[in-house]
Swiss-Prot record:
PROSITE patterns: ALDOLASE_CLASS_II_1, ALDOLASE_CLASS_II_2. Its cofactor is Zn(2+). Dihydroxyacetone phosphate binds at residues 181, 211-213, 253-256. Its EC number is 4.1.2.13. InterPro entries: Aldolase_TIM, Class_II_FBP_aldolase, FBA_II, Fruc_bis_ald_class-2. Zn(2+) 1 binds at residues 83, 180, 210. It holds the Pfam family F_bP_aldolase. D-glyceraldehyde 3-phosphate binds at residue 49. Zn(2+) 2 binds at residues 104, 134. Binds 2 Zn(2+) ions per subunit. One is catalytic and the other provides a structural contribution. This is Fructose-bisphosphate aldolase. The keyword Methyltransferase does not apply. GO terms for molecular function: fructose-bisphosphate aldolase activity; zinc ion binding.
Amino acid sequence: MLVKGNEILLKAHKEGYGVGAFNFVNFEMLNAIFEAGNEENSPLFIQASEGAIKYMGIDMAVGMVKIMCERYPHIPVALHLDHGTTFESCEKAVKAGFTSVMIDASHHAFEENLELTSKVVKMAHNAGVSVEAELGRLMGIEDNISVDEKDAVLVNPKEAERFVKESQVDYLAPAIGTSHGAFKFKGEPKLDFERLQEVKRLTNIPLVLHGASAIPDDVRKSYLDAGGDLKGSKGVPFEFLQESIKGGINKVNTDTDLRIAFIAEVRKVANEDKSQFDLRKFFSPAQLALKNVVKERMKLLGSANKI
């Protein structure tokens, strides 16, 4: 059943666990995520970026999620707009049936971010929809939005306190050192957990970790064995994800891991049987690989058996 994002995250906030927020761009990804949620008895945060919506069509994206909710009526599901860049894109998502939206104005100055976020919150709350915002700037590329290392900024906890109080945003993504994509760290992985804990103490709302894909060893190996190139890639270590939850993270965004796992299996089939053109032969193992990544992440973050 479709529910407000806050219905899922406030429970996680109160009980101290994390919920994976999984991106999708087609039916195969969506089906695998729902199957994982069903098998692990976990609530679901389903995400679509502006780019994914452009690719699928917003009505198709919402329609597929609603059909899957009918198939699995016992699973609480939030449908979330990931990295909405304008008021208009958030409003369009709300009108289309999304139950949670993110307004990402982190590239603006603090006051402009606060003003735009407050405007989105008012609109969305009037429609019964939850809102996420971001403070600080993450390095990396997300849906063709690029932030260089020199422009990445960690969150200021005091600003976060004021931002949450004045905007009335439901959950906040503080920049604590992660980055988008498969190349998250140049040296040893490092996240500012003390900063995270201070943000949690001052805001006392659900917090979100962006750029949280781990690139697990088995997923990396499958991709490399199939001829893929991930030279220099580094994900967020599993122990960092667990430590971030202890520090107050309740929503953990995961996209890159899903893409890598899925494409690895597609490459494998293509390499092993060059005469194969039955799409089901490609997508069935790809869905299984993606489902297994999601299931393991649910157990790691603590959302398994939380329905």
